[in-house]
Design a protein with these regions (language model features):
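Histidine/acidic residue-rich metal-binding segments in metalloenzymes
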Residues: 1-127
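Amphipathic alpha-helical segments within well-ordered protein domains
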Residues: 43, 159-163
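Gly/Ser/Thr-rich active-site loops/lids in small-molecule metabolic enzymes
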Residues: 35, 145-160
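Catalytic adenosine-cofactor/nucleotide-binding cores of aminoacyl-tRNA synthetases and other
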Residues: 123-137
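Short, surface-exposed, charged loop/turn segments at secondary-structure junctions
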Residues: 16-19, 141-146
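Short acidic (Asp/Glu) and glycine-rich catalytic loops that position anionic groups and cofactors
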Residues: 93-99, 136-143, 155-159
Length: 163
């Protein structure tokens, strides 16, 4: 099972990470719990059934820790992270606007640090681009209307990962 862990009832109409940046910009945030509750639920199901769970694009400290604990317990779980989720924080939204609107959203520095630690200690199994390009005219819209995703730049991902 490959899972994009997001609880739509919590992320509904959110456009960036819930926190100080969202408050400063007056934007509705997507809470970490939107990801965390789904990771917790699906780890329980995987452990109970013996199914293999692959969690796509982890982005929160708590989700990384839950996967770490699940692996220690013998749960058949793997996960991936994206280059933007271990190199950029939600502060990038203030500078880049809708070009930094993605799902899951860019998270806090604490979350980024946890993702980096997860890569370093082997909790994270692979790095994936989660490539979701959009035309510049679509990303030029306001936050409510601009799609989630990054404009092109697939060719830059390897350079980001290697630095």
């Amino acid at each position: 099972i490959v899972d994009h862990c997001e609880d739509p009832s919590q992320s509904f109409r959110g456009v960036i990470n819930e926190g100080a940046v969202a408050e400063r910009l007056g934007l509705r945030g997507i809470p970490n719990t939107s990801e965390d509750v789904c990771v917790a639920r699906d780890l329980i199901v995987a452990e109970s059934t013996g199914a293999h769970l692959h969690v796509a694009h982890l982005s929160t400290a708590r989700a990384v820790e839950m996967v770490r604990v699940g692996k220690r317990r013998g749960t058949r779980v793997t996960c991936e992270v994206t280059p933007h989720h271990f190199t950029l924080t939600d502060e990038a939204v203030a500078e880049h606007g809708t070009h930094a609107k993605m799902n899951p959203p860019l998270r806090s520095a604490k979350d980024v640090e946890a993702v980096v630690t997860g890569i370093a200690d082997g909790t994270v199994d692979c790095i994936a681009t989660d490539h979701a390009p959009h035309a510049p005219e679509l990303k030029a819209k306001g936050f409510a209307d601009a799609p989630f995703g990054v404009i092109g730049e697939l060719e830059k991902r390897l350079a980001v990962v290697r630095t």
